[in-house]
Amino acid sequence: MPEIDHIGIAVKSIAQARQIYEALGMHVVHEETVEHEHVRTAMIPAGDARIELLEPTTPDSPVGRFLAKRGEGLHHVALHVDDISAALETLKAQGAHLISEDIQIGAGGHFYFFVHPSSTGGVLLEICQDPVSDV
């Protein structure tokens, strides 16, 4: 059964955005730049899930374009699955509109793909799986 892995929030500045979470006693446990996505990420544990702050490294990146169009705020909700390949095939078979039909490798070596908001009630949905050697 999929579980919420993280909630992605697009921000102009991780340094500025993290201050509100730190004021609440929360702390960034991992920061990383994902070069192929042109984004810096910061993960903040929140119970069994995490908050992922997303800061673009270039204005023409997906997150940069999101900020230019919509401003800071909710970018995506990520669901963790045990078998990302099976999830991808199931969603393809159901006709879901996928951002990409390829599984990508993101922050922390996690595997992921995105489902377009037109298939999910208006929310960009990330499907992700922990790093393993045989995906």
Model-derived features with residue positions:
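Vicinal oxygen chelate
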Residues: 3-12, 33, 42-47, 51-52, 64-90, ...
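Short, structured motif recognition centered on aromatic/hydrophobic residues
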Residues: 4, 8-11, 21, 44, ...
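An N-terminal domain-start capping segment
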Residues: 12-26
